[in-house]
């Protein structure tokens, strides 16, 4: 059994990680930390987990206990993993970080977007960006994995086939993305209140969202050159889900784009390229570690519209983290992740 530690288990990504690992036949959660809830039983805080973690309680982070684990997940706000990851890596413990701490390879760029100096720039050379559909072989050998964000996951998987094939005008990419309210986290905030977010939709961070440099970094690597991206996120009145509507102009209209996408993702267990003319729904991936994609060329022109949907807490966070765990430890990549989406 893989001995697992979780730092920061009281947020939405933390409890989703617990839910998924409860069904994992090769993983056992030995340590889960929370300074604010130390001593509280996991099953008392999350009744949905009763019968799965009845002997497990939250504890104050302890380097010795965490260092005795085979792998530690960080489901924490940005900056926390900076302080603890180095010590764990030195102890031989693998680290899978769900925060943004190691996603960007440029420490100065990270500081610009996150409003503080990068706390562990010396570890960036060891960090592997945990998008399995791109970095599977690097993940197998990794010590430190940076799990991609939710918007970056949906957006990159939608654009990748076009950019890798050199078919898109990389200077004019548009990502029009919608997120459920759980993407804002569990902390109390006026904008996340039911009366504020219900029956309403709005764009936000149009000037620049923290996920912009992460998306741009991935798309630039896929294209092999600089890219131009306009990324506009929106908050929608649903709990879970990301819906990305992606626009690109193709430079060769003779290419069969449906075949291109189907071939690119034919061997990917968690990317579903839907039949031509489809319109994927966020509810079809609720609770599932799946990205569903459909590709369109309206009126047969040179503008391509890619529709990409994920559950922001699963393929956009905790499910992708478990997918990385499976790859890292040489397990079947689908282990513990074969859940179908929840309907209705």
From Swiss-Prot:
This is N-acetyl-gamma-glutamyl-phosphate reductase. HAMAP family: ArgC_type1. Keywords: Amino-acid biosynthesis, Arginine biosynthesis, Cytoplasm, NADP, Oxidoreductase. It comes from Pseudomonas putida (strain ATCC 700007 / DSM 6899 / JCM 31910 / BCRC 17059 / LMG 24140 / F1). SMART domains: Semialdhyde_dh. GO terms for cellular component: cytoplasm. Its EC number is 1.2.1.38. The keyword NADP applies. It is found in: Cytoplasm. Catalyzes the NADPH-dependent reduction of N-acetyl-5-glutamyl phosphate to yield N-acetyl-L-glutamate 5-semialdehyde. Its main location: cytoplasm. GO terms for biological process: L-arginine biosynthetic process. The gene is argC.
């Amino acid at each position: 059994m893989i001995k697992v530690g979780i730092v920061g288990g009281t947020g939405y990504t933390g409890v989703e990680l617990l839910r998924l690992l409860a069904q994992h036949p090769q993983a056992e959660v030995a340590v889960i930390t929370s300074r604010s809830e130390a001593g509280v039983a996991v099953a008392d805080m999350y009744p949905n987990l009763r019968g799965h973690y009845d002997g497990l309680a939250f504890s104050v982070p302890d380097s010795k206990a965490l260092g005795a684990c085979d792998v530690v997940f960080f489901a924490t706000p940005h900056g926390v993993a900076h302080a603890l990851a180095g010590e764990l890596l030195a102890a031989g413990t693998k680290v899978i970080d769900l925060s943004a701490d190691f996603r960007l390879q440029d420490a100065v760029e990270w500081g610009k977007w996150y409003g503080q100096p990068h706390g562990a720039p010396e570890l960036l050379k060891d960090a592997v960006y945990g998008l399995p559909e791109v970095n599977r072989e690097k993940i197998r050998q990794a010590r430190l994995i940076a799990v991609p964000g939710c918007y970056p996951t949906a957006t990159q998987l939608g654009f990748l086939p076009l950019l890798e094939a050199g078919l898109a005008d990389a200077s004019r990419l548009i990502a029009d993305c919608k997120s459920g309210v759980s993407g804002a986290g569990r902390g109390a905030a006026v904008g996340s209140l039911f009366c504020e977010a219900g029956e309403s939709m709005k764009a936000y961070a149009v000037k620049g969202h923290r996920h912009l440099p992460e998306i741009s970094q991935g798309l630039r690597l896929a294209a092999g050159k600089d890219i131009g991206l306009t990324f506009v996120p929106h908050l929608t009145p649903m709990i879970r889900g990301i819906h990305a509507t992606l626009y690109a102009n193709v430079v060769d209209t003779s290419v069969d784009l449906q075949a291109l996408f189907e071939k690119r993702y034919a061997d990917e267990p968690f990317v579903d390229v839907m039949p031509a003319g489809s319109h994927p729904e966020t509810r079809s991936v609720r609770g599932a570690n799946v990205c569903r994609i459909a590709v369109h060329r309206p009126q047969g022109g040179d503008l391509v519209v890619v529709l990409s949907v994920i559950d922001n807490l699963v393929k956009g966070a905790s499910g992708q983290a478990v997918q990385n765990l499976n790859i890292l430890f040489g397990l079947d990549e689908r282990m513990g992740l074969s859940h179908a989406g929840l309907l209705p």
